[in-house]
Amino acid sequence: MTINLILLSLLAYVIGSIPSGLWIGKIFYKKDIRDFGSGNLGATNSFRVLGVKAGSIVTVMDILKGTVATLLPFFFQLNVNHHFWLLTGAFAIIGHSFPLFAGFRGGKAVATSAGVILAYAPLLFVAALVVFLLTLKISKYVSLSSMIGALAALIISFFMGDWILIILVACIALFVIWRHRANITRIRNGEEPKIKWM
């Protein structure tokens, strides 16, 4: 069982490493999104550089990476505690942030982390998504909405009584905020781009 978990974790990392924004940009738009906007491989920069259609596709793909990776033990009928689903999900987040297929320069882990939560705790995903969308509607900042959504997920997770989930969501929230430190500076300086499509 230990070997199987290790293999599934490695597979989850590979799945997380799929650079959706980079590949869609290069294949369909002849653009390397690392050379435009924030230079980030995530969904937000895909929206900014490639447009709403491509950005939406990248977002869905990045969420699915987290969801599929989290469900790997289920797909392979591995008889383990559900907490191990979070292990494979965590490896997908690592893969997305430090992708094997993109020089270990990845996204900020928001969408893929959301996919992990969607697979493990769907109601928590919905609650965090509502907070994200409300914040986005008010502020027009994707970065700020992502951070507040992550913090909301952490707060709500405390009411679920699953300490393994709480620990993972706490790590996700801290990591998301850390990955957005440049965005925080730009928000303070009034230089952070606002979305125009919502």
UniProtKB/Swiss-Prot annotation:
The chain crosses the membrane at residues 5-25, 56-76, 84-104, 114-134, 158-178. Signal peptide: none annotated. It is found in: Cell membrane. GO terms for molecular function: acyl-phosphate glycerol-3-phosphate acyltransferase activity. The keyword Transferase applies. Its EC number is 2.3.1.275. Pathway: Lipid metabolism; phospholipid metabolism. One of its GO terms (cellular component) is plasma membrane. It comes from the Bacteria. It is a multi-pass membrane protein. It catalyses: an acyl phosphate + sn-glycerol 3-phosphate = a 1-acyl-sn-glycero-3-phosphate + phosphate. The keyword Transferase applies. Keywords: Cell membrane, Lipid biosynthesis, Lipid metabolism, Membrane, Phospholipid biosynthesis, Phospholipid metabolism, Transferase, Transmembrane, Transmembrane helix. GO terms for biological process: phospholipid biosynthetic process. Belongs to the PlsY family. Catalyzes the transfer of an acyl group from acyl-phosphate (acyl-PO(4)) to glycerol-3-phosphate (G3P) to form lysophosphatidic acid (LPA). This enzyme utilizes acyl-phosphate as fatty acyl donor, but not acyl-CoA or acyl-ACP. NCBIfam families: glycerol-3-phosphate 1-O-acyltransferase PlsY (TIGR00023). HAMAP family: PlsY (MF_01043). Probably interacts with PlsX. This is Glycerol-3-phosphate acyltransferase. The lineage of its organism: Bacteria, Bacillati, Bacillota, Bacilli, Bacillales.
